[in-house]
Amino acid sequence: MDDIKILKGNIIYTKTKDAFEICEHGYLVCKNGKVEGIYQTLPFRLGGEAIEDYGDCLIIPGMTDLHAPQYTFRGTGMDLELLEWLETNTFPEEAKYKDVLYANEAYAKFAKNLKHSSTTRACVFGTIHRRSTLVLMDHLERSGLVTMVGKVNMDRNSPDELREGTQESAEETVEWMKDVQHKKYKNTLPILTPRFIPSCTDELLDMLKMVQMRYQIPVQSHLSENLSEIEWVKELCPYAEFYGDAYDHFGLFGADAPTVMAHCVYSTEEEIQRMKENGVYVAHCPESNENLSSGIAPVKRYLEEGLSVGLGSDVAGGSTENLFRAMAHARCAGDLSIRNIRH
């Protein structure tokens, strides 16, 4: 028997990115967990079904957070720029996740709060720790949210307690994938997660491409967030024409490996065109870009180019998992960007 759920209220949604569709006092019909249709008048065939009537309340689609890396230290250390912030705040916190009990407590809070937010889908970072990342996936699966979760890879330029051996990092990723397959999650999917180019050697990226091909999983990472970071990538990868080219060199930049890249604040013309050609998704994280003084991503340009752009809370660089707050920051950043261009 089909599982039918009917909501009544003022329904707002979008068929295209340029216009809202509004159905006042309409009916949203879900069949077996998927939207079957939106109706101004309920079809006769559904007349006997129960209706959840929300009166004059708005009914909107659940939101997708394209970049949610950490949580417990959200909104702290905002007097620092990216690289110093990672060393001072992020890495010491992530090292604690070696302790599965600590991870369990932290991830339980994260999953609970995410469920009570406007987000229904998210791309989430774990840490390098395989068991703790599985704990994160367990909590998110129980929440009912639809998520992609990654075990992070780092084999250079990171503290001793967070630096994996190159072979170890690749092998742990394979073992993690086997664990995920064994658990048979319904709503929680794996996503390959090299933290960013400075923390991953060429050898590791080459191995991770083999993992990606073997399991046909998507990729998430960071791109052109900070000017110092970009200069560092130039030193580490002299063969790369631009930051994104370093990922693309190993087949981890869209095309046959669906990819989400966070930030993209300083993407060059060549990088933008490669993202467009390869179908790379941009995770726009306006609050953390402000908090860490990274800059303002040219999102209007990306949309005009036809790139796929979504919002990221980027907790803990952002202060909250609330994507309504991210929307407000995106609007302010967009206004500033346009005014800077005019002047």
Regions found by a protein language model. Give the residues of each.
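Divalent metal-coordination and catalytic microenvironments
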Residues: 10, 28, 33, 56, ...
